Amino acid sequence: MALTLDDHLEAVANVYRREMLLALTDHNPQFDRAALTYGSNQPLEDRQVALEMEHVHLPKLVDMGLIRWNRGEHEVKKGPEFEKIEPLLAVLPGRRNSLVDDQSP
């Protein structure tokens, strides 16, 4: 599947997907957030994020070919299409929490 600019923008539009992709630029592989926050003793918000990662965000990035995800090992690696999104990620390092909330001039 050839990814379009819209696909790349959709991939980084969510903070959790963006954080995972940015983390992979620094360290490949990563452990998925779901594995780290899935325990019942975690705050509800963390468990909700874990569920979103497992059922929405990581599968979306897999479908795009941007990551490879080994659910059993809770390991995320760069996918076959990852190099195509790297130029976009390169302009985001100072904006890991938001693309539009930065109020600096």
Outline where the language-model segments fall.
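Short, amphipathic alpha-helical interaction segments positioned at domain boundaries
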Residues: E83-P105
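Short, Lys/Arg-rich nucleic-acid/phosphate-binding segment
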Residues: R71-V76, F82
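Short alpha-helical segments that sit at the start of domains
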Residues: M1-H27, D32
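A short, conserved structural fragment
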Residues: L58, V62-G72
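Short acidic, hydrophobic short linear motifs in intrinsically disordered regions
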Residues: Q30-D46
